[in-house]
Structure formats: structure tokens, C-alpha cells
């Protein structure tokens, strides 16, 4: 998990003194947004060859892949532009970066500001509660929400109903939150970390 390249922190945290009398511990003080996937739909057909001439760091080989690939440096982002007018943005690390990346594509078809409003579809965040976790106990206590098969995958999968996100929980205390297949906001990622904290404290290894 250390190879994830975490580079953005968030100061929100939960003090365990607020969680049923546990000793004072700060969980997920420095969780990070690792990747955001968003889309733009400009609702018009795009001539990808013409667009490639307008944009730097663009690649288009229709025999290999049906989209134009564009790499942006500031903010760091990779975009896939399809003929249908759909644009997929990946690699940003905040909602602000998503909006900034979307503005880079206003040159396509003389777009208006409203045409580049991005929709976030998936957000991946990583946190560390700083203590080891009894995954077997967590799985037993919350069997209706969890999948734990250590012979296949070392982490426990926790499917949270509200907010609707998936958490990958590891014995080391590392937790990955992803909003796969749903429209997710950063505030929901924060809520997920808050809601999972008391469960992890109850299954803390001693």
C-alpha cells in the first residue's frame, strides 16, 4: 500500500474521545485523495483529428483505441476524448483540480462554460488509522456488509450503504475508500472515514 504515491492531505479527523469512551486516538488525520475519475459530455460529435491539432501532448491512433488521449500537466490529468463528445478525466486529486482540468477543453467546438461542468463518478482515498485491526472480528460483527477471504485477498471489503462507497480495510490499519459506480463527493469520503472509525476501534488489536 505504500506504493500508492500519496501526496495530498486532509486535516479532518475523528477524536475517539467522541466514540463511546475509547481512549483518545485520532483516526485518519491525514487521509489522501489518490485519484478522481470524472466525465464531461459536450453533447456534440467531435472531430478527433482536428482536436489533436489544437491540443498539446495528444495521441490519436484509431486503429489501436477509439479515443484521443491527452495528458495535462497542470493539474496533472489524463483525458480520453471520444467522438461522441464524452470526455473522461482521470488522475486529479481534488474537486478543484477536476474543474480546472475540465476548463482546458473549452477549445473543443467553442464550448460555453456550462458545457464543461464535470461529473465525478469515482473517487479513491487512502487513510491510516495508525493501529492494527482484527479483520476476522470485523467480518463476524458486520457480516452483512463485509467480504473477507484472506486466501484470495489480504484485505476486508466493507460495502457501506450510506454513503454508498466501498472500503478496503487492511490488518495494518490502512483503509482505501472508493465510490465506484456512484456519483460521489469528497464530503462523502469524509463521512465514510468517520462512520468506519468506531467499528475499527472496536476491532483494534491489543
Roles of regions detected by a PLM:
Residues 1-166, 172-174, 181-206:
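Intrinsically disordered, low-complexity polar/charged tails and linkers
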